[in-house]
């Protein structure tokens, strides 16, 4: 899940960029409160985005003030105060990281050492937020079961991850949750799974690992897929998700920070999709540029 949901920073207002960074620090502090300091190493902007939009949907304003922390011990910076929603998001972040490394170990990749860093934090999540741990565990188990069927359906392949985010939104939003919020987070979760699968196309092809895009289209590489006629189908899949996100947003009321939420959802996700479809990674580094640089 990690690394794909980002703001389109050149189009952020200064106030929104300040808020975005402050909420990133807030989630970091939330992780430390619930799971301990070592668990902060798994912090991602993906969960920061969830903090932005879920505080908004719950109608809860975020209090920000200058503070010091372990990382910024000399110079203070703007940080969001930690509330119960932030703590829940910190628990979600830690559970996701722990299970990610568990999955890496099962796939034969290195991950045991890294997982140890999050073991104590994960145990705290299980004790204090068992519902969050259950949501993550059961949906990831369903994801594993689906992938073992070797389905070539993109919808079926992404369903468990999409449901995981939708289930968490129901839990975190409480009485503010409704069909439109569930549809929104389902579409976001589906996008995350599919953009990750597309990004991993070449790696999975080389390893012989499961990837729905490989089974559905059979191209030799990600770039070969995008350059072919089938590339238009892939683009259509993502455009359909963007439509679903816009449709869900049109039915929701945002009390605070609408500009930041819209930037991430309506500009950030399409930007990241374009980046991956052009052959670059999530950070915008392209293989072709790397090769040219070596020459």
Describe every region a protein language model picked out.
Residues 278-295:
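Mixed-charge, low-complexity intrinsically disordered regions
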Residues 1-183, 190, 194-241, 245-257, ...:
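Acidic catalytic motifs of isoprenoid enzymes
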């Amino acid at each position: 899940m990690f690394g794909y949901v980002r703001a389109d920073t050149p189009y952020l207002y200064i106030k929104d960029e300040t808020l975005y960074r402050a909420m990133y620090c807030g989630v970091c502090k939330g992780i430390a409160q619930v799971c301990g300091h070592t668990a902060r190493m798994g912090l991602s902007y993906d969960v920061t985005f969830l903090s932005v939009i879920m505080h908004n949907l719950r109608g809860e304003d975020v209090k920000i003030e200058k503070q010091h922390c372990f990382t910024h011990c000399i110079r203070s910076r703007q940080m969001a105060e930690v509330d119960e929603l932030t703590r829940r998001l910190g628990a979600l972040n830690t559970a996701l990281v722990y299970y990610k490394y568990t999955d890496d170990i099962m796939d034969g990749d290195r991950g045991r050492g890294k997982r140890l860093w999050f073991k104590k934090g994960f145990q705290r999540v299980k004790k204090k937020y068992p519902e969050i741990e259950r949501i993550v565990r059961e949906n990831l188990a369903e994801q594993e079961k689906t992938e073992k069927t070797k389905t070539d359906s993109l919808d079926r392949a992404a369903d468990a991850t999409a449901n995981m985010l939708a289930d968490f939104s129901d839990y975190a939003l409480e009485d503010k949750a409704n069909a439109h919020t569930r549809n929104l987070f389902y579409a976001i979760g589906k996008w995350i799974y599919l953009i990750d699968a597309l990004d991993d196309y070449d790696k999975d092809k080389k390893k012989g690992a499961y990837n729905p895009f490989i089974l559905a289209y059979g191209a030799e590489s990600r770039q070969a897929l995008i350059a072919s006629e089938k590339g238009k189908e892939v683009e259509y899949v993502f455009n359909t998700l963007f439509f679903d996100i816009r449709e869900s947003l049109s039915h929701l009321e945002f009390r605070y920070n609408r500009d930041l939420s819209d930037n991430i959802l309506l500009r950030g996700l399409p930007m990241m999709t374009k980046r991956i479809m052009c052959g670059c990674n999530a950070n915008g580094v392209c293989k072709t540029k790397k090769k040219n640089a070596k020459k």
